[in-house]
Amino acid sequence: MKLFLISAALVVLGLAAVADAIGCSDPSPFQGRWVIGVDKKECVALVKEKCGNLRDYTTGRWVRGQHVKSNCGSIPKFTAIATFLKPGNKYLGHAAIFESCASDGIWVYDQWNAKPVERRKIRYGNTGKPNYNGDNFYTIEL
């Protein structure tokens, strides 16, 4: 009975964590084009315009959620993710739309001011560019 209660509690906690993930619309139709919003062609423009109600919030309101690499199996496809490299786990770096994980990185859709939306792999272990290191991505919560 005790084992059952512990298992049930873990399932509920896991579901709560997934429920906090901010879902995004399928970004694949936008490949090769920029998604432009108040943040112009920056990475956050894609995420703010295509994910939940993020356009209503500045990045300063974003909260670091689940670590993508550690929780890959439970993060839904097309979830808003970002790096939170500022002190206090505040957003700084890069934002993208999560697709899936691979053994050597994460597959995302992203853009930045020099590159329109594309599907690409952000590899783990890129210590030279922490904002492009798959180890540093977390789900975005509000």
Curated annotation (Swiss-Prot):
Compartments (UniProt record): Secreted
The EC number(s) this enzyme carries: 3.4.-.-
GO biological process: defense response to bacterium; innate immune response
Highest taxon of source: Eukaryota
Alphabetical keyword list: Antibiotic, Antimicrobial, Hydrolase, Immunity, Innate immunity, Secreted, Signal
Ranges in coiled-coil conformation: none
Miscellaneous comment text of the record: Acquired via bacteria-to-eukarya horizontal gene transfer events. Bacterial type VI secretion amidase effector 2 genes (tae2, AC P0DW66) have been transferred to eukaryotes on at least six occasions.
Biological function: Tick gut and saliva antibacterial peptide that directly antagonizes host skin commensals which enter the ticks during feeding. Acts as a cell wall hydrolase that cleaves the bond between gamma-D-glutamate-meso-diaminopimelate of a peptide stem and D-alanine of another peptide stem in peptidoglycans. In vitro, degrades peptidoglycans from both Gram-negative and Gram-positive bacteria. Is not able to traverse the protective outer membrane of Gram-negative bacteria. Is not able to kill Borrelia burgdorferi, one of the Lyme disease-causing bacteria.
Stated name of the protein: Domesticated amidase effector 2
